[in-house]
Amino acid sequence: METVESSSSAELLRAQTHFSRQVFSFQNFAALKCALQLGIPDAIKQHGKPMNLSELTSALPINPSKAPCIHRLMRLLVNAGYFAQENECFALTSLGRLLLKDDPLHIRALVLSEFHTALVMPWFALSEWFKNDDVAPFATAHGKSFWDYTSCDPELRNVFDGAMACDSHLIAKALVTEFKYLFEGLKSLVDVGGGNGTLARSIAKAFTNLKCTVCDLPEAVANEQGDGNLDFVAGDMFDRVPSADAILLKSILHDWSDENCVKILKNCKRAISGKDKGGKVIVIDGVVELQKKAGNDDPGLDNMDMQMLVLFNSKERNEKEWAKLFSDAGFSDYGIVRTFGWWCIMELSP
């Protein structure tokens, strides 16, 4: 067996470089969060053209004594691809434009949520959790479950809902164009756990004859207003799901254990069981290994799987695991419509 001592200097340097990139990768994300909080992307856009360092620092709400440090922050973010630098001026890249407040597909909330203190702390409790009896590392770090914590912390709840909305904007664009046939012939649809209704609003706007309902916990829908063919109802998917031609579950089941998933799915099946033919449940979630078979080598779903472990002690599932859940919940058949990005669309028949 080869030892470290027997490795060549070049091999050791490559290993050190690899570890350095991994260890320091968090700095790129922390710097990006800082840039958002300081308003750097929007400052550059509002300027209307690339900004030099003096113009940029003058536009930011910072202590003047810290202005000389901005160029070091920008250097890191340029290397990470969020900004471009030419002739001592900074401009937005296509990636950086996704950080603008007014971009309809912006991912600002996703960035801010992933580096929220309350969501980072459980990662540092991971090794302790492996040794104790807590349900999830989040509980080890905070003394309560994620859902109990967010119910008492409106700020974190808003950040979390905003992150889910970012994801929903991207998915909605695909659903109402490439996958619009999923909604053809339907008269009613319930988006279970749909939060502020980002996804349901897009569907309702695209299909004006489809009655769309968002069903979520009271605190999630308390301040939401329905409009036209969209409304909001307070409810608990573990107790009952409102009746409809179709039930939509987007990024819901990966938050829960197999046992809880079966409970949710059974309630969804009851909600469509009284309908004429065409009743179905639409699940949008990850399917481990399927993306790789489709040529997507992005390790993002592996990262998401660990995120589910840390927050909820839940997981991303492979097709065999999904099939068992659907069968245990009483569904007669399912089909995977298509994969896109990390996500798969699955149609369940009662």
Curated annotation (Swiss-Prot):
PANTHER family: O-METHYLTRANSFERASE. GO terms for cellular component: cytosol. Keywords: Alkaloid metabolism, Cytoplasm, Methyltransferase, S-adenosyl-L-methionine, Transferase. CDD domains: AdoMet_MTases. One of its GO terms (biological process) is methylation. It comes from Carapichea ipecacuanha (Ipecac). It comes from the Eukaryota. The keyword S-adenosyl-L-methionine applies. This is Cephaeline 6'-O-methyltransferase IpeOMT1. It is found in: Cytoplasm, Cytosol. O-methyltransferase involved in the biosynthesis of ipecac and benzylisoquinoline monoterpenoid-isoquinoline alkaloids natural products, starting by the condensation of dopamine and secologanin, and including emetine and cephaeline, drugs used both as anti-protozoal (e.g. treatment of ameobiasis) and as emetic agents. Mediates cephaeline 6'-O-methylation to produce emetine. Expressed in roots.
